[in-house]
Amino acid sequence: MSDFDIAKTTSPASRLVLGSTSRYRRELMQRLCIPFDVAAPDVDETPQDGESPHDLACRLALAKARAVAALHPDAVVIGSDQVADLDGEPLGKPGTHERAVAQLQRMRGRTVVFQTAVAVVCQVA
């Protein structure tokens, strides 16, 4: 019996759910060779006024995990987010080719940090 089998038989949560539509996060989870489901979180990703990229990533990771956990109360849910940080300013997804080019030009010669956050929610007592 593997460690995962032992955890599976003693844990009140019956399954693991990744709260993300990111194919990259799904691929990372698949590398663990642990069975999991995927659910799309319905979360507004708009930054709040004055919110740092770090705080934005943390807030969104937790919001995604909570949103999916509300739909899957029997599961351990993993939510995550990553925000590009250019001098303390969050860089969103450009959306268009023109905006992507402008964003890349703005980043040229500067350091961009990727703030990454992971949240785990389990509602099973």
For the regions a protein language model found, what residue spans apply to each?
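A short, surface-exposed loop/turn module that caps and links secondary-structure elements
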Residues: 47-52
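N-terminal G-site helix/loop of the GST-like fold
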Residues: 13-39
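Short, acidic/turn-prone active-site loops that include or flank metal/cofactor-
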Residues: 40-46
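Anionic-ligand binding patches
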Residues: 2-17, 30, 53-125
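Short loop/turn and capping residues at structural boundaries
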Residues: 39-40, 115
